[in-house]
Swiss-Prot record:
This is Small ribosomal subunit protein eS1. It comes from Halobacterium salinarum (strain ATCC 700922 / JCM 11081 / NRC-1) (Halobacterium halobium). InterPro entries: Ribosomal_eS1, Ribosomal_eS1_arc. NCBIfam families: PRK04057.1. GO terms for molecular function: structural constituent of ribosome. Belongs to the eukaryotic ribosomal protein eS1 family. The keyword Ligase does not apply. GO terms for cellular component: cytosol; ribonucleoprotein complex; ribosome.
Length: 206
């Protein structure tokens, strides 16, 4: 392809400023290039929490997906929050236990979220202690989802309040070194949840 044709193609493209959701004050995430607005939809972009929120944890990586496009900007929705791989590796210690669970919750405003907390013990915990810690994590995560809106739950996760609550409770079972939410993923929006419920009702009525 000639330099002339490449230059012409580039001139036909447009840069769109990608913005975070309202939960993150529509902070600028970066830019994306496209010929047509339709090409921008569903693209994903990642950012550290510290890039979109003052004082945010640099070890938390956020993923957003473009869901609306304007003349020169694109809005996004939250997809996932996850600890960076390097930070996860730094938490592992020889001679201790890693206790992890996966819990799916429905918030008060009908968002379905999959949450994966993990607890690291100071020394090796036995099976009964690990089971009790796991049960505590499940109970507290389910309680957090049942009592909060999606935005409040997300803030509780990325600000470390949910991890702290789990630590305080589970540490009475066996001494813990650290508790983190390894990953939190938005599985379904309210309209998707409602559609699934309606479909389930239709099937049950047949």
């Amino acid at each position: 392809m000639s330099e002339r044709s490449v230059s012409k193609q580039d001139q036909e493209k447009r840069w769109y400023t990608v913005l975070a959701p309202e939960e993150f004050d529509r902070a600028e995430l970066g830019e994306t290039l496209a010929e047509e607005p339709d090409q921008v939809y569903d693209r994903t972009i990642q950012a550290a929490l510290s890039d979109v929120r003052d004082g945010g944890d640099n070890n938390i990586k956020l993923t957003f997906q473009i869901d609306d496009v304007g003349s020169d900007s694109a809005s996004t929705q939250f997809v996932q929050a996850e600890l960076t791989r390097d930070y996860q590796r730094s938490l592992v210690r020889r001679g201790s236990s890693k206790v992890a669970v996966t819990v799916t919750v429905l918030t008060t405003d009908d968002y379905r979220v999959r949450i994966q907390p993990v607890a690291y013990t100071t020394k090796q915990a036995d099976q009964s202690q690990q089971h009790a810690i796991r049960r505590t994590m499940i109970d507290l995560v389910e309680e957090a989802g049942e009592e909060r809106t999606f935005e409040a739950l997300l803030n509780s996760i990325i600000e470390g309040r949910l991890s702290s609550a789990i630590y305080d409770e589970a540490n009475t079972i066996y001494p813990l070194r650290r508790v983190e939410v390894e990953k939190a993923t938005l599985e379904a929006h309210p309209e998707e949840v409602h559609e699934e419920e309606e479909t389930a009702v239709d099937f049950s009525g047949e």
